[in-house]
Amino acid sequence: MFLGTYTPRLDDKGRLTLPAKFRDDLAGGLMVTKGQDHSLAVYPKEEFTALARRAAAASRSNPQARAFVRALAAGTDEQRPDAQGRITLSADHRRYANLSRDCVVIGSVDFLEIWDKQAWESYLAEHEEDYAQARDESLGGIF
């Protein structure tokens, strides 16, 4: 399970060091794709493969679903962390997420999100008041 907030820095070669506690879960390979709200989503390879296969199976007769699968496949990069736990983020991914040197990696239960630090702080400030309402509406009192 991916939980927590971490603040790694992007180096001059576009490499980001993944939080140490997640490296074992991602050692078998990972997939970096464009996420929501101009973040990047990082999935374990097996998890992403299962999601992509389900999306592809549903898309054969639906033009919107086919377009989504095309964009998903074209915007995804397979990575394997190096010995220091770093992955190289493509220029396209860095541009999409508007990544500066200071980044934030957050756990989103079954995947990670990579954000530009300033964008993450703005997102939190903008949505802070909505958190309690969203929790109550979407989780119905579980928490």
UniProtKB/Swiss-Prot annotation:
Name this protein carries in UniProt: Transcriptional regulator MraZ
Cross-referenced SUPFAM superfamilies: AbrB/MazE/MraZ-like
Cell compartments where the protein resides: Cytoplasm, Nucleoid
Top-level division of the source organism's lineage: Bacteria
Family stated for the protein in its record: Belongs to the MraZ family.
Organism of provenance: Nocardia farcinica (strain IFM 10152)
Keyword entries, A-Z: Cytoplasm, DNA-binding, Repeat, Transcription, Transcription regulation
CDD domains, sorted: MraZ_C, MraZ_N
